[in-house]
């Protein structure tokens, strides 16, 4: 698995170095390309160049693919490739997949992989369609690409955005601070993607029969609800005096 991650990161860095990957059509230093590739695959969102203004459409596509691979997991991506190529998945590969997603048993791994892929692309598609009206309103036809990019980035919890411009410093989603649609869609994508595939497998399989959920799913759902609700209420309480104080 480690070698797989390293290989994907290195390949991504080499591609991002190419002039076609930048808006200025110049070579990117290896350390900058390597940092960007690592950040994308490991879905950290840290950048040394603004993603929206520095990278070309090709470069942004490479970054998005790296984010998607990182979000799915290298092993999941590899198993997906084997499935699409029609090859049989060996017991060793099934065991690697089991370890990668913390599945309780090896049996049903192929079914679970299909569920992961279908679920991922379905949620990302719905997210992109929901964001489409806003981004197309503001950016025209380019809004289609922006909706897709931010939907995938949010679902994979990657933190990358392409809203930056050469004359501004990393604005991210600050322009949409008062837009409820963008805020709600991005938040839901982050939560759905962050909960994990096994938890959603439980939700889709057992519905409201919570007692049938895996212990892991119960802990994740409870912890997610608490860690979202308590800080949100705390921030509302802390910011309330500030909003009431008149500005001199």
What would you call each of these model-derived segments?
Residues 1-248:
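Membrane-proximal intracellular helices of multi-pass ion channels
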């Amino acid at each position: 698995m480690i070698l797989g991650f390293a290989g994907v990161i290195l390949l991504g860095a080499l591609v991002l170095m190419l002039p076609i990957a930048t808006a200025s059509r110049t070579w990117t230093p290896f350390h900058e390309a390597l940092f960007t590739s690592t950040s994308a695959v490991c879905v950290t969102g840290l950048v040394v160049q603004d993603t929206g203004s520095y990278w070309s459409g090709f470069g942004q596509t490479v970054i998005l693919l790296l984010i998607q691979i990182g979000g799915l997991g290298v092993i999941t991506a590899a198993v997906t490739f084997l499935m699409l190529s029609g090859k049989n998945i060996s017991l060793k590969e099934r065991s690697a997949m089991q370890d990668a997603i913390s599945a309780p048993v090896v049996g049903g791994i192929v079914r679970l992989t299909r569920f992961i892929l279908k679920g991922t692309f379905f949620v990302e598609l719905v997210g992109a369609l929901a964001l489409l009206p806003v981004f197309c309103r503001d950016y025209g036809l380019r809004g289609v690409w922006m909706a897709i990019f931010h939907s995938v980035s949010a679902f994979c919890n990657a933190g990358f955005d392409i809203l930056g411009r050469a004359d501004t410093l990393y604005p991210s989603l600050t322009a949409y601070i008062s837009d409820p649609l963008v805020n709600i869609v991005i938040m839901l994508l982050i939560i759905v993607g962050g909960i994990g595939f096994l938890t959603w497998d439980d939700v889709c399989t057992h519905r409201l029969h919570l007692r049938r959920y895996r212990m892991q799913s119960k802990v994740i759902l409870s912890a997610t609800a608490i860690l979202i609700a308590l800080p949100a209420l705390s921030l509302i309480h802390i910011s309330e005096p500030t909003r009431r104080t008149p500005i001199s």
